[in-house]
Structure formats: structure tokens, C-alpha cells
Amino acid sequence: MKLKPGCFARSLLTVAIGATVASWSQAQENASGAQGLEEIIVTAERRETSLQDTPISVLAFGGADLEKFGIDDLGDIQHSVPNLYMRQFPNSQASLRTYMRGVGNNDVGMSTDPSVGVYIDGVYVARSIGLGSEVASLERIEVLRGPQGSLYGRNTIGGAINMVTAKPTGEFGFKGGLSAGDSSYGRGRVELDTPRVGGLAAKVSMLKSKKDGWVTNQGSGPNFGDNDSFASRVALNWQPTDDVNVDYAYDMTDADSGTIYYQTLEAPLFGFSQVPYQSDRLDDVRPSTPVQESNVKIKGHALTVAWDISENTQIKSITGYRELDQSIYQDYSANRVTTRLYANAPFDNQQDQFSQELQVLGKFLDGAVDYVVGAYYFKEKGDEDSVDYITLPLGFLPPYPPIYDQLLEIELPHRVSSAENEASAFYGHFVWTPAAMQQLHLTLGLRYSKDDRAVKSSSSSQGFEYFTSDVDDSWDNHSIDVTAAYDITDDVNVYAKFTQGYKTGGFNIRATSDYAASLPLSEETVETIEVGIKAQFLDDRVRLNAAVFSSDYEDIQLSFAVLNDPTNVALYNAGAAKIKGAEIDLTTLITDSLKLTLGYGFLDTSVDDVDNPQTPEIEQNPAVLPGAPDNSFTADLDYTFPSFGLGELMLNVNYSKVDEAEFVSFVQRGFNIPGYDLWNARLSLGELSMGHGTASIALWGKNLGDEEYLLDGIESFPWSPLVAPFGEGRTWGVDFNYEY
């Protein structure tokens, strides 16, 4: 699927580059007064530090970046971060499967954990359900690539993502925005800040978004890909004294969505000759039965209390409680014509979690050592209820003639399960800068983790119970990380680090036998060596950050759907895996008006020493790591036009390219997700005086080349070797924002 950029995309890029000629000349004349790149502050090490002083391969996106790239939810950032790969879960737009540096999870079940940790204001979010939904008042996203060791611990074996929301300003203020676009897209948001009274300030945010799906449903029910969501957030900041700061936030999301359309792409198998297929993207289909909406509701509370007990010591408490309730409908069999083939997979689950973290941050040895020590506790519980139905005419199956129209109704196993997970940890992170060598920074991190998991599950069909299972197990881990960083100059530093990572063990909640459901997974571990450089030069007009790494995984956890039976998901410790790779992030301020940002990621993955799995057919197929494209590339161009007396006119053009990637751990029928290219652009006019505030208006377009690309794939259905969803085609819209 090769990109054919539209004239609009090529024209925008040509205008942006061509317009630099006069600006470049002007910049040379005014070099002495030229501006540099802005400093980026991150909290990757649990304290505020400059991006350039943080020995981690990290990218940060502030509020302006989120608006510029049209990032409405976490899933949108993957096209701006090399070596980050995200896929929607097959039966939910709101659920994300996240892979970083080639490591991720194909399942979102309660009996296993993700490989990439996601945090909202420091609170760990255990389930990826709902991460594809919009978050109100999002201020910054930080992407930390690679295992995060002592400071984050369990389940950050691939990396971590920090989502930071806006805090109350303590002054009266208002922000609002309206958006409209094709496919009946509409979005509105408001954000209100109150003045600080008695040490208390508040921020209230609300967001409403609605859009028709990109595959029209010619039958009954919503379009495929419909979305209708509401999110709100109330944030309070209380400063009773100069030494105490209290932040509390309540957030909620309520999102309705149409099912993702899984298109039959290859010729049917096993006599399903009447099932139509098409390799090009379909724009409309006619399901055999009415399509129903899916819904996810999320609520969360977060309380952070920071107390400066002395000039060099702070105690911080982070308390979080979150709950979710999800009801999913999925139709895997809709086609352009009604075939009476019907495959439906309803799925319901609930989850709630509580976490408490206590940190002590400070300095000692006359400021030579910065430290963070802490204790962490986490508990979650939840349940799932799922069943799959297939209805088809017997004429689809030999030896029945094609005209034989009697329906065969099949109820596949009905699974009911519940899980309780508990985790605790103690950790310390110390950074020593010797007084005799201020350019050297040595880091030592230590962490002890313990996990307990209990899972109950049962499987039945049409009144017959196949099995019930009631199991529990526990795991623990000691890990270290060591870093040596050296400042070659004030603007150039290099680092080398060794990090151990840990992902807790679990059980297979999708198992189809008591034996498979009762067999525990061992914990997954990794050892990573990384070498990097962070540099700014040419009067801070060029920023270059790069890293190379090598990771060795033991007992890596892989899952896959058994051939011809999508309800049978095998999960086990496959053995050892090795990942080598690199990341390069380059930002250059070519002129005061033109900024170019380039990013590149490379991965070389292999799965070695594969243990003998339970399913013999897998022995004949190579094991691979899904979500690990060899190459990923991003380019972003920002141009500010010369002033013409009315606001500030800016153009952004961004491009992303990703190589093909596997979507299953074991290649069974030879399919994968082909590589693709995407072009986006945004033309905005800002700094417009309006009343007592300022306004901006913007015209934007996404996937300007109307690229046909796949998001995922399933090759385990008996009626087709491959069904897969396409990504959204070309879209456009207009934004209006106002603040005072």
C-alpha cells in the first residue's frame, strides 16, 4: 500500500520550504539576536528535570504540540514517536495494545499485565481499556522508551507513558474550543480556572466529541467506527502553608462507539464460497443483524500531597482509585451484501483499582546526591463475561449444496472469570555528582517487587460446563539499574546505562481447558544496555538526542489465537528474545520562522530458544514479536509566516512512515500489517485579539494522501485466512479556540 500524496499535501510542503528563502537571509543578518530552542521540562525521573539532562530516551509533547498534531487521545501519539506502535483491541476502539521497542501485549485480560506502563498524574493505570478515549485538560505527554527500572518497576519492561493534566492556575481564566469537520465531526471543550481563595484554587474541564464512522452501515444500527464521548475533570489545588501542596483530581469518561469494521480481505476457506471478499477498503457494508454500540465508563480519583519538611527533603504521597465498566459488541462478519453469516462477540467487564505510593525526595552530602526512595502498594479486582456466536447457512459448508439455506447456530464457549491482583514494592534511586568531578553523574537504582494474583474462570456452552478453574500464585523480583552520564560540555552529554526490568507472571484467562487455565506464567525479565548522547549546539538552534540499545529477554510472554478457532487463545512463556535498536531525535531551528523535527527508530528482533508450546502446530512456524516494525520515521515542519498585521499565521506539515509489522506472535498463514505513510497538515491563525482575550482559528487535514492501511488482523477465522480493519481515510476539519 504505497502512499500517493495528494496535491494539497505536496503544495503545503512546497510552500513551507519555499517560504524559508527570505527568512533564511534575514536570520543570517540578525544572527546575534536569534532565538534558540525552548527548554523542555520532564518528570521522567519523578522530579522536574531538563529533557537534555535526563539520561533516558524520552520524547515530550506539550499542550501546543498536542493541538498541532491533533492528538485527542493516547493512541494518536504513535505517529509522532519512533519505536512506539499502538493497535486498537479487536473489539473496542477505546482499548489500546501498546508496544514500545518491540515489546507489548496482545491481550487486555485481567490475568496478565501490559508491558508498557501508563500513568495519569503519577497514578498507574493497570488496564489499557479506555486509553483510546479522550482525556479532558491534558497538558503534556511524556514517552519514556525502554525498561524504566527502579523508579517505575513492574510492567514497564518496554517503557512508560506519563500523561500530565493541567493544574489550577490560581487566577481566573477561561479556555474554550469548537471543532467541526467531515463525517459530521463535532467537538467542544471548556476549561475554567477560579481565583485562589483561602489557599484553594480549582479548574473545571469538560469535553464533548462526536463523529460518524468511516464505514457506513447500510443496515440497522450505528456506522462502523462511530464515536460519541464525553469527558470531564475537576482539579483542586490547596496550599494551606508555604511548605504543603495538595492536588486532588476527579476525572470521568463516558464513550459510546460503533464496532470496528473487520473486512474479509482474502478468499474464503473450507467451502465458504458465498462469503464475499475484497482487498481494497470498503466504504459501506450491510450486516446480517443490527449493529449495537459499545460503551466504556471510567472514573478516577487522584490525591497528591507534597510536604517540604526541610530545604533539602520532601515527602510525597500519591493516592489513586480508578474504576471502569465496559460493554462491547463486535461483528466480524459484515460484508457489502447480506450473506446471513453472522459472527458476534459480546464482551462485558468491570475493574477497579487502588494504589498508594509514598516517596521521600531530597539531597545529602552537601547536595552531591539526589535521591528518591519510596514504597508502593497496588490492588485491583475485576471480572469478565464473554461469549461468541456464529450463525451461517448450511449451504456454506460441504457436502451441503450452496442453495441449502437452513441456518446452523453455534454458541462458542461462554467464559466467566474474575481476578484479584495485589502488588507491593520498595525502591531507591540515587544520583551522585562527585564534588571533584562535576561533569560526572553516577546513578544507582534498586527495587524489590512482589505480586500476588488469584483467578477464577469457567467455560460452558449451551448448558454444558467444560471446566472451572480456581488458581493463585505469587512472584517476586529484585532489580537494579546503573547509569554513568558525563557532561562533555555544558550542552553535550553522553550516558551509558544497564537496566533490569520485570513483568509479573499470570494465567491464561482465555484458556479452553482446566489444565491451560491453571498453568501459571513465569515472570518476564529483561536486561538492557543503552548508550546515548544528548546535545544542543549552534546557539541552541539544533538539538540532537540519540540512543542505541540491546535488550535480552528471558521467559518472554507471547499469546496467539489458535488457527481456525479465534476463541482459543494460547499464552505461555516462549523462551528468550533479543532486541537491538536505535532512536534518533533531531530538532533544528533553521530560521526563527522555520523549525524542522525528525525522528527515526530502528528495531532488530528475534525470538530464540522457543519452548515447546501446548499447541503442536506452532512448532512448524517461527516465533516473532508483534508490533515491532524494523523502521519507523517521523518528520515535522513548522513555519511562521511574516507578520501581516493580523495575528500570527503558522503552518505545520507532518509525515510518518512505518514498516510492515506482525500482528501475531506466530506466523501461521503468512500475513502481516503492511507498512504505510501518513501526511497531516494544519494551517492556523492565532493571537487574534477578541474582547478581553485572544482567539485562534485553524484548518487541518489528516491522512491527506488518503492512504489505505491496516490497523490489525485476525487469521484464525475458518471462513477467511485474513480479516482486518482499515484505518480512517482522508479527513479535514476547522478549529476555533478562545481564551482569556
Language-model regions: role of each:
Residues 1-81, 242-246, 588, 685-687:
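N-terminal Sec signal peptide and the immediately downstream disordered periplasmic leader
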Residues 6-9, 347-365, 370-374, 496, ...:
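Conserved C-terminal beta-signal and adjacent last beta-strands/turns
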Residues 35-171, 531:
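Acidic, small-polar-rich N-terminal luminal/periplasmic segments of exported/outer-membrane proteins
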Residues 302-308, 314-332, 487, 493-503, ...:
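Membrane-embedded beta-barrel scaffold of Gram-negative outer-membrane proteins
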